[in-house]
UniProtKB/Swiss-Prot annotation:
<dbReference type="GO" id="GO:0005829">
    <property type="term" value="C:cytosol"/>
</dbReference>
<feature type="active site" description="Proton acceptor">
    <location>
        <position position="89"/>
    </location>
</feature>
<dbReference type="Pfam" id="PF01702">
    <property type="entry name" value="TGT"/>
</dbReference>
<protein>
    <recommendedName>
        <fullName>Queuine tRNA-ribosyltransferase</fullName>
        <ecNumber>2.4.2.29</ecNumber>
    </recommendedName>
</protein>
<feature type="binding site">
    <location>
        <position position="333"/>
    </location>
    <ligand>
        <name>Zn(2+)</name>
    </ligand>
</feature>
<feature type="region of interest" description="RNA binding; important for wobble base 34 recognition">
    <location>
        <begin position="269"/>
        <end position="273"/>
    </location>
</feature>
<dbReference type="GO" id="GO:0101030">
    <property type="term" value="P:tRNA-guanine transglycosylation"/>
</dbReference>
<keyword id="KW-0671">Queuosine biosynthesis</keyword>
<comment type="function">
    <text>Catalyzes the base-exchange of a guanine (G) residue with the queuine precursor 7-aminomethyl-7-deazaguanine (PreQ1) at position 34 (anticodon wobble position) in tRNAs with GU(N) anticodons (tRNA-Asp, -Asn, -His and -Tyr). Catalysis occurs through a double-displacement mechanism. The nucleophile active site attacks the C1' of nucleotide 34 to detach the guanine base from the RNA, forming a covalent enzyme-RNA intermediate. The proton acceptor active site deprotonates the incoming PreQ1, allowing a nucleophilic attack on the C1' of the ribose to form the product.</text>
</comment>
<dbReference type="GO" id="GO:0046872">
    <property type="term" value="F:metal ion binding"/>
</dbReference>
<dbReference type="InterPro" id="IPR050076">
    <property type="entry name" value="ArchSynthase1/Queuine_TRR"/>
</dbReference>
<feature type="binding site">
    <location>
        <position position="304"/>
    </location>
    <ligand>
        <name>Zn(2+)</name>
    </ligand>
</feature>
<keyword id="KW-0862">Zinc</keyword>
<dbReference type="InterPro" id="IPR004803">
    <property type="entry name" value="TGT"/>
</dbReference>
<dbReference type="GO" id="GO:0008479">
    <property type="term" value="F:tRNA-guanosine(34) queuine transglycosylase activity"/>
</dbReference>
<feature type="binding site">
    <location>
        <position position="143"/>
    </location>
    <ligand>
        <name>substrate</name>
    </ligand>
</feature>
<dbReference type="GO" id="GO:0008616">
    <property type="term" value="P:queuosine biosynthetic process"/>
</dbReference>
Amino acid sequence: MKFELDTTDGRARRGRLIFDRGTVETPAFMPVGTYGTVKGMTPEEVRATGADILLGNTFHLWLRPGEEIMRKHGDLHDFMNWQRPILTDSGGFQVFSLGDIRKITEEGVHFRSPINGEKIFLDPEKSMQIQDALGSDVVMIFDECTPYPATEDEARKSMQMSLRWAKRSRDEFDRLKNPNSLFGIIQGGVYEDLRDESLKGLVEIGFDGYAVGGLAVGEPKADMHRILEHICPQIPADKPRYLMGVGKPEDLVEGVRRGVDMFDCVMPTRNARNGHLFTSEGVIKIRNARHRDDTSPLDTKCDCYTCKNYSRAYLYHLDRCNEILGARLNTIHNLRYYQMLMEGLRGAIETGTLDAFVADFYTSQGREVPELVD
């Protein structure tokens, strides 16, 4: 992978990630394909929304279908018929989400399979081996996602273990002679000094990109903004910056304003299946009765297949009848909305008009622009 940085507007950055399988324009949003599929979508449909890269889930793909089946197909690209870049998370966050059914030690994590209760052990080395089998273009180190809330001492211990796991991940990645890219993950909770220590340790190990982890796990939005404003300027400028698991459209806007290059989140697809649709004027709840006889499209500013061909009344009808097509059309729209938002942000950075773009984004929804600390 090669990262090119074209221009900046304030802290916001416009560039691209160049892979053998294709180029990813940044800032970029990655749709989430947890089990090797963006729910309800064919790869061609996902690509048509403007997606350059997808995210796959190491933990879930390891449990089902497993490494052996993946290697029989070649890799995850061949298995799911997506011949463009794929980033896979390491499984750390999913293990964190298991709660009481997992035990974290220095060696790794012991837990029971959420599928059949089988005892399983996952460590940095195994995570690297699984992601090698997946053929991930971007591999993430195995880390512990620091919970919120956590005391500073708890966050320090978690972060320092993640640093030790980062070194083990790097060593195993190199031992496997994996030709792809490996990203480090900055931890430290809401504590700036711990974030500094984490980044310093990761840079000493050396990675192809740096992710900010452990945010959007329950902390106030102001804390997320504060940590991003503090840590992003310290990340090496020639490396991509990835904010993991974020988020709402406004979170993408605020992340870009603070120098983030990459995002992922299940929100556009999950919300689509629940009838919550993003538009240039805010969120529409399509199952609300006021849409029952509305012949207008979801968003007159959207060029997606759904908005060009169907009315709000039809989408309301599909939702009320629990038709599969409704979830699919909603997903197409939400994914396209996210990609159009990223296209707009990239264009605004290129032309030096990001402030105006951000102001229009918020005012069109009747909201105030959040303060950005200089």
